[in-house]
Amino acid sequence: MRDSMTPASHAARHTPLAATLLALLSFEENLLLAAAPAAPPAPQETAIITAAVQDLFTRPDETSSVDDQVILGERVEILEDTAGFARVRTAAGEVAWIPERALRRGVTPAPAGTKVARVTSNFAHVYASPSFTAQKPLLSVPVGATMVLSDFLEDKGGDASSWVRVGLPDGRSGFVASRDVALLPFEENLPLRSPSEWISFGKRFLGAPYTWGGTTPLGFDCSGLVQRIFREHGVLLKRNSYEQAFQDSRLVPVSFDKLQPGDLLFFGTEDKIDHEAMWLGDGMVLQSTRHGVPGVQVTRYDSPFLKPLFRYARRVRGNSSKGEEEKASGLTRARARDLEAVLRGIAASSGARFGIYVKDLTTGSSLSRNSSLSMHAASTMKTPVMLEVLRRVDAGTLSLSDEIPVKNEFKSLVDGSPFSIGLEESDAPTMKKLGGKASLEFLVTEMIVRSSSLATNLVLSLVGAENVQAFTDALGAPTVKVRRCVEDSKAFDLGLNNETDAAGMAAVMEAAVRSPKLSAAARAKAWEILAGQTFNEEIPAGLHPQSGAVVGHKTGSISSVEHDASVVRLPDGREYVLVLLANDFGANEEGRRKAIDAARKMSRAVWEAMIAP
């Protein structure tokens, strides 16, 4: 809902102070530059917030849901405009809609020596003159708001107070009591300070009401409170609790038994993080909650609204004890042993036989089970075909823009006799081009993302199965056998099938993103295509829905097998390979469903191990 205390912006006056303000890039951005998440692409336009507190909306409509809040002096990036609204990106990366009246556009770099007044009290009044009694405030601004410093006055208002003359983003000037602000050079970073100071600062807001989307003492939601505490201590966290839990590079995993005051606890269900609190020690937390009297509270962790829903703990990077690791440990040897036992149990309960291979591409640690068990490759064989195409593009003997004739006629591996394949829904985009031509890039993409057998046979006929096999061998995956086109019944009858095992397919997937035998451009293209996969019911479906992980993968499914081979890229940039090959599940839909469900459970278990402290 919209905050009724949000003041309207005023028409700007082009004063020298306003000109200085227009030159301000944003105190917030430079102040927190080192602490901010990875920067988005360069903005086309920037603007400064002119309202004391302004709601951001999910749609260009002030009756829509509130997504976030921004405050005076913050800088936003303009993404698009519509009638009376702009779609903006905040410094923390949140994208939402804001009324145009709350913006001052035309932001350019700040002049050298620019100083700002940053509000440090819960609220500060800005007056037209240096007096508490001469007139009502022009506006009241919350902690964290920033204004350009113009002058410092020593008790010139007769109020036994020193005053600071400031420039407001809408072009006006005013006065604020010096005790309510910190005067800082534009370039200066706020100090991280200590957990005791974070906690003391957070307790200043006790009793502030719970407000969905709120980030100020007028009202906080749970993540808005945490973000404000750390923002005023030099750390710009992501806006939402699930983002902080899984996607924020400034936070690292920590075990519950190693919690320190100032650590963050995240709560929710197995598939949704929707609350967070700050650990105070002695079983107490600081939170903004809807329970009890909705607002900022100090609460016991073991309350029925918290302890049963605890999921993860995180620590601000730089707050660990000396010598303690500040990262997820990934797949250590000890963890690999424990994880192998978990995966073995899931496989046993599924009724299927699984070939499993897991490798942490950062630590190099791996685990496997039945990883040399050879199975029909099904459509997983299409990844080696793609890599041979990309190798040839690197060599200059093919181009992804080459136009390839599209026809449903292929030669059997056995005797060269012609055959055609039965066309399915996955072939529809390629089928539309029958009798014409399609680019090699189109065919390779369709081969992977929609698993088109028509596209596969066209590409494999172009590059040759023997060449695919030679490059697959060179990539360290000789147990992956690419022998023939799809639906070559004569070859099938003679037992000439495409085959794989989990270890070999893991080597192929790792090569797709890491092998020096492919150029960086080729690896990037392989990732782009694999990450565009449209069949996502196994490994991707097992990940936490809010994880922020991206999966590049290829599935394979025929009557007797159910496969998924992947590279999973975590938000912190780490990658791991996960290959799950299943057969002997009864070749019926119930057996297949159990195998798919087991693959999802294994995927979740591997992901949990990779993000653990």
Regions found by a protein language model. Give the residues of each.
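Boundary regions of SH3-family modules and the immediately adjacent low-complexity/disordered segments
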Residues: 36-44, 89-118, 131, 157-201
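Mid-domain, small-residue-enriched loop/turn segments at the edges of structured enzyme/sensor domains
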Residues: 353, 436-440, 444, 450, ...
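Beta-lactamase-like hydrolase cores
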Residues: 326-373
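Beta-loop motif signature
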Residues: 39-42, 48-78, 119-156, 210
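Structured C-terminal helix/loop/strand segments within mature extracytoplasmic catalytic/sensor domains
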Residues: 320-346, 462-464, 507-538, 543-546, ...
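SH3/SH3-like beta-barrel superfamily modules
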Residues: 66-99, 139-177
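Aromatic- and glycine-rich peptidoglycan recognition patches
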Residues: 131-137, 251-254, 280-329, 582-584, ...
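Catalytic cysteine-centered active-site loop
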Residues: 209-224, 228-261, 523
